[in-house]
Amino acid sequence: MHRLLILVLCIPAYGQTLCPATPTYSICDITFDIPGTMPRDTELNAEFRGPSHRTFLVRAFRSFGNRLTVRFSPSEAGPWDVRLSSTLAQFHDKQFQITANPSDSNGWIEPANLHHFRYTGGAALAALTPPHLWVGDTLPVISGTTLESWVTARARAGVTHVRMQVPNLMDEAAFDELDVRLALVNKQNMVADLVLTPPAGDRQAREEFFRYVIARCAARNVTWVILSDFEKFPHARDLVREISSYLDEDPFHHPRTVGATVTSGVFADEKGMEFREYGSPDWRISAVEDQIYAKPAVSVIQAVSADEFRHQLWNDTMSGTYPEAVTTDPAMLTYLGVWKKAFADTRHWELEPFFDVDNGRGLSLPQTEYLIYIEKPGPVVVRLDGKHKWNVEWINPLDGQVIESKDLKDENYNGSTPDNSHDWVLHIYREGHKEGLKSYHFESRPVLMQDVEVDAGKVPFEIAQPAGDTIPAAAAVPYAAKLKRETKASRNMIYLWTGEVTADGEGYRVLGTATSGEFHVPAGIVHHFPATLHMRVYGLNGLGKLYSLDQNFGIAQ
């Protein structure tokens, strides 16, 4: 997608400039020049009605002092009727038409198939729209030719998303620079993940700011990230809900999430939150929450070394998340490109976490393919769904080299990594069966969420600590889970400890992910005393069954 040059077609009576015939999912700017002084409370809205009679209401934003710009992106080819409403009499209730031409764009993205994404366009029927593979990187503070080179390098590596910060002031020069970045990214068919931070000021100032952002940016191919790390903001839940209410005015309904230091799962059930974000390098958090929330997720991967980056990339993937990287080393970009190529050759939009493996973590589409990450090289055992002819290959996550192995005709794979010098990825698949599934354009099977076992009598562990009914507000608190009975599945239990002060409404925070350890009551979740901490402990066993226990503790000041 690209920014079009404005056609010099002016209607003097209205001071109006239209855009030329515009390819679908490309920018169409319609400008209105206002003579004299324009009142601060001036409003101009445009209702676009497409060939299929779907309508979009778009606000104008102010630019160049006395200019109003309506920025739109048509989603289908053909004539679009435009009707204006405005506080300015010369524009109110005026009508005209623009034209959209067909393009090869697949459109915006949207959540699909529980934990994945698809495009909104690119096919005549919604059910036939292509899947979207999220591969993200984060834009550093650069400009000019350096910016162009950076974007080009990401496109070559297969990156499909670029994360960037939106200015938190209504500064026209800053937003002009943002427009340049957005145009470069979208031109390479990459989505811009826009991180939103509120300006200083009251609610009225925030509303004015976010309306400006939506009017100026929503016609681009974007997603919205509310706050960078919500946990750092006081009364974060109210602030997130407020900003989300402004985003409800996005006429294109781009996906949104909340930026998190640890997890935005606390907002997963909120209106409009369409995917989750993880900022913690601890893959256990997303592994457990993938079994709880029927929404896709991305992990922000920040690592000091390239090796650490690669391990986190693949571990987070096996937890069911897509990568949103912060590459600070050329090797990191190489590893991200290897990841992209590996998944582009799979039915990635149908893969879900797979647990029946020894010395590895996996994803699978039953009866079709398995992708297993072996972090510690050595022997690996994979119990497959049925005795079929399976193709087997090893992928080197450092350079993408593929080593083909002997075909397998069994329901179990027993083998070892090609060498023990680094981590490996094992790909087991049925080539002929995968080819046959091409007639299923998106979903070849129903995907259901499991029911979490909450019956204490059936949960294979208990809360051993904290002991007693009260915990301190400021001191370290020990926590521990104790297995009631040990089995092969329970020996590999993954725990997630969360705490919430329900009365104060901030939602839960992660307290720990180990069998035992210590935590401090997060300050941001307690506003009033006396207070009660609602603790919940999840246990995900080695076969993928999820359990939970709850217990309340008074918080002593």
Feature-to-residue mapping (PLM):
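Short, solvent-exposed loop/turn segments at the edges of extracellular beta-sandwich modules
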Residues: 87-89, 539-545
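Active-site mouth of glycoside hydrolases
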Residues: 43, 89, 103-275
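Extended acidic/polar, glycine-enriched regions
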Residues: 56-114
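Surface-exposed, flexible coil segments in extracellular/virion-facing regions
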Residues: 500-520
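Short, solvent-exposed loop/linker segments at the N-terminal edge
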Residues: 19-25, 36-39, 469-476
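Short beta-strand segments within Ig-like beta-sandwich modules, predominantly Fibronectin type-III
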Residues: 60-62, 406-408, 509-516
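Aromatic- and carboxylate-lined catalytic core of secreted/periplasmic carbohydrate-active enzymes
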Residues: 16-21, 38-43, 295-299, 305-406, ...
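Extracellular glycoside hydrolase catalytic/binding regions
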Residues: 222, 228-334
